Structures are given as structure tokens and as C-alpha cells.
């Protein structure tokens, strides 16, 4: 007779007594905590008892969440998010340190420049204040010395030369001569004849005065009518006079303009010596 059939648990529905006892022991604290959390208590709104806080902590630890992993404990490895947070914190700290260092350096530079400015001589009111003040002071000093040198050169040039304009009746242009380069009226007359040689023509053969004396011959008032051109000048008083009435040195200081005019137009003009002689008569 075959042996009786025994019921076998192939799926594992029936747990062993040891496993069931262990599972019951493991689930008992959680059930107790959950029951304590759900229990009704008397208290003010919003207040929490220590037992409820502990229960919430246990429930949170036992629950599964989809958020970021909690920070590592002990010697566990760091997560990706944690490493990023720490790197950003280090960068922020380094940036703050660099900013503080730059501010300190700027303060030290300003302090040093302020001490240099306090030790430097005070600039004049007319000088332009720049930065740094030492360079602007040197620039203003060089500009003042250059202006002074330029003024001295101009003064020397004005003292060393005496330029006057020369015009001629019928000539379409003007010339300018330096009276300091000539030593007498004769030299000036020759130079002007060379300048305006194309406009000055020979006089009539009846007049035998030399070519040199043609522009400056003012010794006789009657001779002006016979001369084709006569040299006149404008003095400081804006009066037109015949050349030759003053000594050469005095003439160079009083002459402002020269004009070679026709003898017929200068018939009413005479040197000052002849005018004074006529008044005395």
C-alpha cells in the first residue's frame, strides 16, 4: 500500500515559526510608532509632543522617497550633488577672498598716493590737476618753461629784426624787407630797385641824377616833379613822409610802412627839414 501524500509548500505561503516570529518582532516597533503617531492627544494647535517627533523621524526614515539621497554618514562616498555643492562653496569662498584682497590692495595704493601727494609741493592755481599729481606737476612745469622759452625767442627775434611792408604804385604785389639788414639809405634804395626792377623805368635823359639817388633824392622839393618814383614811409603817427629826413638809426625805429609812389603824386611832400626851413622863413 503506497504511503500517504504529504502537503508540501512549494510557493512558500506557510512560513516557518522562526521566520514568523522574527518578522513579528521586526514589525512590532514600526506598528507601535505608527500607532503612537496616529493617536489622538490633547494640546494646543501646532504643538508637537516628543513622542510624535520621534515617530515622524522613524516614519521618514522607513518611507521611500523620490528626492535626493540624504547626506552620507560615516565614511560613505559622496554623491554627485554633494560634490557640486562643495565645489560651488569653494569657488564662492575663493572669489570672496580675491575681492577682499583686491580691496585691500586698492586701499594701500590710495594711501601711498595720498602720502606722495602730501609730500609733493602744492601746484599753482593755473596748473591743471591730473593723476598722479607728480606727473601733472612736471607736465605743467615743462609747459611753463616751453612758453617762457618761446616768449624769449620771440622777443629776441623782434629785437633782432625790423620787417616792414613795401608797396609800389602800379605793382600788383607787396614785398617785405628787414631794415636791420641795411646800413644806409643807399643800400635800401638799391635793394628796392632790384625788387621792383620790372616796374621802375629809366627817367628822361634830361635829368642826369644817378640811378642810386632816384628813389631817395629829396634834397630839393622841385626835384620831386622830375623823378618818376619817390620812396616814402609811414611813421608812428601814421603820417607819410619822404625817406631821408631822419638819421638812419632813427628811421629804422620809426618806420612802419614803405611806399614807392610816383613823383607827381609826391610833389606836395617834402622832408621835415625843408618843412621846418619853410616855416622859419
Curated annotation (Swiss-Prot):
Record region (Disordered): 66-126
GO biological process: auxin-activated signaling pathway; regulation of DNA-templated transcription; response to auxin
Compositionally skewed regions (Low complexity) per UniProt: 114-126
Keywords: Auxin signaling pathway, Nucleus, Repressor, Transcription, Transcription regulation
Domain spans labelled PB1: 161-265
One GO cellular component, as annotated: nucleus
Reported induction: By auxin.
Expression tissues: Expressed in etiolated seedlings and flowers.
Subcellular location: Nucleus
Classification via InterPro entries: AUX/IAA_dom, AUX_IAA, PB1-like
Basic and acidic residues compositional bias, start-end: 79-91
Domain of life: Eukaryota
Residue positions of motif EAR-like (transcriptional repression): 40-44
Oligomer status and interactors: Homodimers and heterodimers.
Family the entry assigns: Belongs to the Aux/IAA family.
Protein role: Aux/IAA proteins are short-lived transcriptional factors that function as repressors of early auxin response genes at low auxin concentrations.
Protein name in UniProt: Auxin-responsive protein IAA19
Organism: Oryza sativa subsp. japonica
Gene from which this protein is expressed: IAA19
Amino acid at each position: 500500500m503506497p504511503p500517504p501524500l504529504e502537503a508540501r509548500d512549494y510557493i512558500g505561503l506557510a512560513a516557518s515559526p522562526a521566520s514568523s516570529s522574527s518578522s513579528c518582532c521586526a514589525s512590532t516597533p514600526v506598528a507601535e510608532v505608527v500607532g503612537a503617531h496616529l493617536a489622538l492627544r490633547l494640546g494646543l494647535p501646532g504643538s508637537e509632543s516628543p513622542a510624535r517627533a520621534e515617530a515622524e523621524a522613524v516614519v521618514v526614515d522607513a518611507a521611500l522617497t523620490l528626492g535626493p539621497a540624504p547626506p552620507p554618514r560615516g565614511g560613505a562616498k559622496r554623491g554627485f550633488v554633494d560634490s557640486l555643492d562643495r565645489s560651488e562653496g569653494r569657488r564662492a569662498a575663493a572669489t570672496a577672498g580675491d575681492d577682499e584682497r583686491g580691496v585691500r590692495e586698492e586701499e594701500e595704493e590710495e594711501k601711498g598716493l595720498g602720502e606722495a601727494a602730501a609730500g609733493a609741493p602744492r601746484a599753482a592755481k593755473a596748473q591743471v590737476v591730473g593723476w598722479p599729481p607728480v606727473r601733472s606737476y612736471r607736465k605743467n612745469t615743462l609747459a611753463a618753461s616751453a612758453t617762457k622759452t618761446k616768449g624769449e625767442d620771440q622777443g629776441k627775434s623782434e629785437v633782432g629784426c625790423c620787417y616792414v611792408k613795401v608797396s609800389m604804385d602800379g605793382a600788383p604785389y607787396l614785398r617785405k624787407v628787414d631794415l636791420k639788414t641795411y646800413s644806409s639809405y643807399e643800400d635800401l634804395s638799391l635793394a628796392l630797385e632790384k625788387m621792383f626792377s620790372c616796374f621802375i623805368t629809366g627817367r628822361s635823359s634830361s635829368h642826369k641824377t644817378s640811378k642810386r639817388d632816384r628813389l631817395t633824392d629829396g634834397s630839393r622839393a622841385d626835384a620831386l616833379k622830375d623823378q618818376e618814383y619817390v620812396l616814402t614811409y609811414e611813421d608812428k603817427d601814421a603820417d607819410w613822409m619822404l625817406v631821408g629826413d631822419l638819421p638812419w638809426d632813427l628811421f629804422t625805429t620809426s618806420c612802419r610802412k614803405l611806399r614807392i609812389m610816383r613823383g607827381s603824386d609826391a610833389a606836395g611832400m617834402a622832408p621835415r627839414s625843408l618843412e621846418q626851413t619853410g616855416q622859419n622863413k
